[in-house]
Structures are given as C-alpha cells and as structure tokens.
C-alpha cells in the first residue's frame, strides 16, 4: 500500500489553487469538478462536496494536522508571503527550535495549518 495524496477542504478552489501556486510553486495536474490535484500530491476539495460526503461540519483552524514544507531561504519566503498575502494569520512568527531549525506556522485561506521550515539536515548540531 502507498499513500497517494493529502486532501484539504477549501471554500474557493481557484483562490486556493492560486495561493498554493504563488507560495509553493504547486501546479494543477487534474481538475475534476470540485476535486483538484496539485503537484506534490496535494488535493483541493470543494467544501460543498466534502460536506455532502461526510454530512459533518468542517472546522477551520482545528489545529489537528498541518501541511509541512521546507525552504532553505525562509526569510525570502516570509517576504513573499507578506507581500502577496499581507492579511495572512500567523500561528507562530519566525522562530528557531532548540535543534536549530527555523520555522513559521500560519493558516491558509481556509484555516488549514501550514508550517514552513528550513531543511532539517542543514542545521548545525
């Protein structure tokens, strides 16, 4: 068995597609009417479709999982984030863990938690 994709629920697929392209360079591989697959295996699912499948409420900012990305030049990434999405809501501004990794956490447009960190292997021990 193999993990194929990670799916997140979004209110506006086009805005979310642009967000993930702008910040992470993800491109669309398949658009299947409310179910969009991006490069790196991220799937955007229209909230209305997901709600019909589950018959449950969607809880933004539930903080129960996160999408994790690595970026060598995290300061340049933060500049880009703040330029393109100045009203982004941070969970943690830039911080450095005890093992030397720099990270930030913020919510995407729909309250999905994202962490961006410097590559772990590049930290001096």
Q: What are these language model-derived features?
A:
Residues 1-15, 65-67, 120-125:
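N-terminal beta-strand motif that seeds the catalytic metal site of vicinal oxygen chelate
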Residues 1-3, 59-64, 97-98:
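Short glycine-enriched loop/turn motifs at secondary-structure junctions
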Residues 8, 46, 98, 105, ...:
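Short beta->alpha transition motifs characteristic of CBS
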Residues 12-26:
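Amphipathic alpha-helical segments
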Residues 13, 67-113:
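Vicinal oxygen chelate
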Residues 17, 36-37, 45, 88-91:
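A generic "structured core" feature
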Residues 25-30, 87-91:
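Short secondary-structure junctions
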Residues 27-61, 113-118:
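Conserved short beta-strand elements that form part of the metal-binding/catalytic scaffold
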């Amino acid at each position: 068995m193999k993990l194929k994709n990670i799916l997140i629920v979004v209110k506006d697929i086009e805005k979310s597609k642009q967000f993930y392209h702008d910040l992470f360079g993800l491109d669309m591989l398949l658009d299947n009417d409310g179910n969009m697959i991006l490069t790196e295996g991220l799937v955007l699912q229209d909230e209305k479709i997901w709600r019909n499948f589950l018959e449950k409420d969607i809880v933004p900012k539930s903080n129960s999982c996160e999408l994790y990305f690595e970026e060598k030049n995290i300061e340049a990434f933060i500049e880009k984030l703040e330029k393109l999405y100045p009203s982004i809501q941070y969970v943690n501004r830039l911080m450095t863990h005890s093992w030397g990794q720099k990270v930030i956490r913020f919510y995407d447009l729909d309250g999905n938690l994202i962490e961006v960190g410097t590559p772990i292997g590049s930290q001096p021990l």
